[in-house]
């Protein structure tokens, strides 16, 4: 069993692992349209959500003629704080192979798909991407800083 075929990280109960990577499976819309999602987070074990103790993170994937623009907006909310540093892993399903990936305009390093998730739970500094032509998945790994991020995936 290779790392690429490994099972996802599972937890038996809330807070078993207070900090863990978040994986987003993204199926982009047709050209000129968007796929959008809002990540909702709260304590998970109390009624704080009734007191507006939560945060939301809007995520939008825009399909362009030459690639995808993935926008992760800054966390919005109050009363809840993410318990520590963690990674975000985006898996974008695409029929086209990417040429390059940039984060905030800066080109990021490409790695092999089987190496992308190495030390994913502990190394919260690495920013890399990979292309798996067998599955048609472009994966982008980056630390969750809680702020605005713009990821551009350009086609060949």
Task: Identify the function of each model-found stretch.
Residues 55-57, 88-90, 119-121, 126, ...:
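Generic alpha-helical propensity signal that fires on short helical segments
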Residues 106-146:
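Extracellular/luminal ectodomains and secreted, surface-exposed scaffolds of diverse proteins
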Residues 147-156:
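Low-complexity, intrinsically disordered segments enriched in Ser/Thr together with acidic residues
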Residues 1, 6-99, 103-106, 111, ...:
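Catalytic core of carbohydrate-active enzymes
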């Amino acid at each position: 069993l290779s790392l690429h075929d490994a099972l996802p990280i599972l937890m038996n109960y809330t807070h078993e692992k207070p900090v863990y990577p978040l994986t987003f499976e993204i199926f982009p819309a047709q050209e000129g349209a968007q796929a959008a999602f809002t990540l909702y987070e709260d304590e998970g074990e109390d009624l704080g959500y009734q007191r507006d103790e939560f945060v939301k993170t809007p995520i939008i994937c825009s399909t362009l003629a030459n690639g995808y623009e993935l926008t992760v907006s800054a966390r919005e909310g109050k009363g809840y704080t993410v318990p520590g540093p963690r990674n975000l892993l985006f898996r974008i399903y695409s029929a086209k192979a990417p040429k390059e990936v940039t984060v905030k305009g800066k080109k990021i390093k490409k790695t092999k798909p089987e190496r992308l998730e190495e030390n994913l739970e502990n190394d919260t500094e690495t920013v890399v991407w990979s292309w798996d032509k067998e599955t048609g998945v472009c994966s982008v790994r980056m630390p969750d800083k809680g702020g605005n991020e713009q990821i551009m995936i350009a086609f060949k």
